[in-house]
Amino acid sequence: MKRTYQPSRRKRKRTHGFLARKRTPGGRRVLKNRRRKGRWRLTV
């Protein structure tokens, strides 16, 4: 049976990267919340 996690740098950046987050209102909310919480890393 194939594993569900098949790592790919490009896919990871495109779906969870900073620019991807900036692009949508929901993503911007994620960034805002992570900034407020004081996360070291905002995105992947």
Swiss-Prot record:
SS bond list: none
Gene3D superfamilies: 1.10.287.3980
InterPro entries linked to this entry: Ribosomal_bL34, Ribosomal_bL34_CS
Keywords: Ribonucleoprotein, Ribosomal protein
Gene Ontology biological-process annotations: translation
UniProt key word Ribosomal protein: yes
GO molecular function annotations of the record: structural constituent of ribosome
CC terms in the record's Gene Ontology section: ribonucleoprotein complex; ribosome
Disordered: annotated span: 1-44
Keyword Ribonucleoprotein: yes
Family recorded in the similarity comment: Belongs to the bacterial ribosomal protein bL34 family.
Name by which UniProt lists this protein: Large ribosomal subunit protein bL34
Organism: Thermotoga maritima (strain ATCC 43589 / DSM 3109 / JCM 10099 / NBRC 100826 / MSB8)
Upper lineage: Bacteria, Thermotogati, Thermotogota, Thermotogae, Thermotogales
